[in-house]
Amino acid sequence: MQVSVESTSALERRMTIGVPVERIETEVNKRLQQTASRAKIPGFRPGKVPMSVIRQRYEEAARQEALGDLIQSTFYEAIVAEKLNPAGAPSVEPKVFEKGKDLEYVATFEVFPEFEVAGFEAIEIERLQAEVTDADVDNMLEILRKQNTRFESVERAAENGDQVNIDFVGKIDGEAFAGGSAKGTQLVLGSGRMIPGFEDALVGAKAGEERVITPTFPEDYQNLDLAGKTAEFTVTVNSVAAPQLPELNEEFFAQFGVQEGGVEGFRAEVKKNMERELRQAIKTKVKNQVMEGLVAGNPIEVPKALVDNEVNRLRVQAVQQFGGNIKPDQLPAELFQEQAKRRVVLGLIVAEVVKQKELKPDEARVRELIEEMASAYQEPEQVVAWYYKNAEQLNEVRSVVLEEQVVDTVLQQAKVTDKSVSYEEAVKPAEAPQAA
């Protein structure tokens, strides 16, 4: 077998492979022999059909099968011999494909980039330090109460924060428009759910009252047919309801799975959850900075095949998340290109750090992470057991732990500065990272 390799770009390889005719004929004859042993042809006993008849009937099919198999097997032999690491399936172009001649074909493919990750000591990390105070717990209790607000009907004019039940009919230039009318809509005034000016115009209205309001759609409104236009809405207020915050009592605590301990028991449970959220937020922000530093300090080219595969995965995830009748391949690839490339870059860099530092998942940390996740459930022991019975889920946790170990490895050499902040600032979501 003859092999030659040409580098057509940084990652693309064009490999020409020649397979001797003798090897081809050996594979063809092997298939014909197998066919002869089981062929059923009228006038001949099974296994007694002359080879000339077998060749006449089956040689073409046997040759095509042999050539297809040889291309697969010789491609694998060639990349092993040439020490190449393809990043995707090759594009195969036959050059000589004739009976009685050596097979020659060209396989074009991308390879994984070869690089070493460096520059750990140049990465700057700001590690947040925070704690959950009593005031933070008080604030969280108020948030939980507001999230469980109930509205009770009142006989007074509507105020900001009240919930009104309304019917409305909207028109532009005297003509009704799609989505401009509804009945029985529940609307909390001041929530910003409707276009600017709509909710403000209903403050002071009473049940049974009808108001005509004329708000203007924003210039950047998602429906371009309505953007910038002034509409006239005839709104009928059916009812007004005032918000009622629930009391901190046993009934309220039970909604969150806390059955005993009263207010102090509930506060302790809330604080425990907040501390878990805080640890995770700080860890995530440190990890993001580490990954940003690794990407910035190790610019690499990535195979288009890997990016395309990641784009397809992101398309599928988007359809699963947002639903609808759209198919994944109907979503423009450009929407996901930057995110996909960044994921591929990070994946290759993290894998290289694991390889260079010879890292393996710390099983004690795997167990610790599973137990921490399980603690959020009512029966944590069952959750832990479930993870250890599901190999796929367990391997996902191991991958997370391995990434954490990569972060720890970088932190040992990076420039780390601790910064004391409030709980609220520590858990605030970070800005989205820039594309690689």
Swiss-Prot record:
Q: Which domain of life is it from?
A: Bacteria
Provide the alphabetized UniProt keywords.
Cell cycle, Cell division, Chaperone, Cytoplasm, Isomerase, Rotamase
Q: Which SUPFAM superfamilies match?
A: FKBP-like, Triger factor/SurA peptide-binding domain-like, Trigger factor ribosome-binding domain
| Reaction equations catalysed | [protein]-peptidylproline (omega=180) = [protein]-peptidylproline (omega=0)
The UniProt entry, under Pfam families, shows: FKBP_C (PF00254), Trigger_C (PF05698), Trigger_N (PF05697)
Q: Which GO terms describe its biological process?
A: 'de novo' cotranslational protein folding; cell division; chaperone-mediated protein folding; protein transport; protein unfolding
Nucleus as UniProt keyword: no
- GO cellular component terms attached to this protein's record: cytoplasm
Q: What is its main location?
A: cytoplasm
Q: What Enzyme Commission number(s) appear in the record?
A: 5.2.1.8
Q: Which PANTHER family match?
A: TRIGGER FACTOR CHAPERONE AND PEPTIDYL-PROLYL CIS/TRANS ISOMERASE, TRIGGER FACTOR-LIKE PROTEIN TIG, CHLOROPLASTIC
Q: What does this protein do?
A: Involved in protein export. Acts as a chaperone by maintaining the newly synthesized protein in an open conformation. Functions as a peptidyl-prolyl cis-trans isomerase.
Q: What is this protein called?
A: Trigger factor
